[in-house]
């Protein structure tokens, strides 16, 4: 289980970030992207949080909100979370669903992502790219 890197083995990889609007983030990632909620907590030393993952993956996203904490700064427009979606029909369906929920397509900072991809901002302004590609394997 886990991923073997050249100098260590990691059991899991978590990408964590703060938000000031946890309920909207949950709506976007759970209802909009249909990511599976794999964990959550509340009032843990003043923090509430939720974790989302892809089925059978050793990595997940965590979003936290601190009681009385400051709003996280808006990220650079080239700070991206990319989902490689090889099926064009599925890509159209997910982006259509998000647009119906009120999340509109935005122009990519890097024109590479506009060639076969759709970029949509989450409630905090972080950009999600749905790229019509099989991705890269690194093998």
From Swiss-Prot:
Gene3D superfamilies: 2,3-Dihydroxybiphenyl 1,2-Dioxygenase, domain 1
Domain VOC, first and last residues per copy: 9-133
Database matches in PROSITE patterns: VOC
Entry-linked InterPro entries: Glyas_Bleomycin-R_OHBP_Dase (IPR029068), VOC (IPR037523)
A Pfam family of this chain: YycE-like_N
CDD domains in alphabetical order: VOC
UniProt protein name: Uncharacterized protein YycE
Protein's gene: yycE
């Amino acid at each position: 289980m886990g991923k073997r890197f050249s100098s260590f083995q990691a059991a899991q990889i978590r990408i964590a970030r703060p938000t000031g609007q946890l309920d909207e983030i949950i709506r976007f990632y759970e209802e909009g992207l249909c990511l599976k909620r794999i964990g959550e907590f509340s009032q843990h030393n003043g923090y509430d949080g939720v974790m989302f993952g892809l089925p059978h993956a050793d990595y997940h996203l965590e979003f936290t909100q601190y009681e009385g904490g400051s709003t996280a700064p808006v990220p650079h427009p080239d700070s991206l979370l990319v989902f490689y979606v090889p099926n064009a029909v599925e890509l159209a369906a997910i982006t259509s669903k998000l647009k119906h929920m009120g999340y509109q397509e935005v122009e990519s900072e890097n024109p590479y992502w506009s060639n076969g991809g759709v970029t949509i901002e989450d409630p905090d302004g972080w950009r999600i790219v749905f790229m019509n590609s099989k991705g890269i394997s690194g093998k």
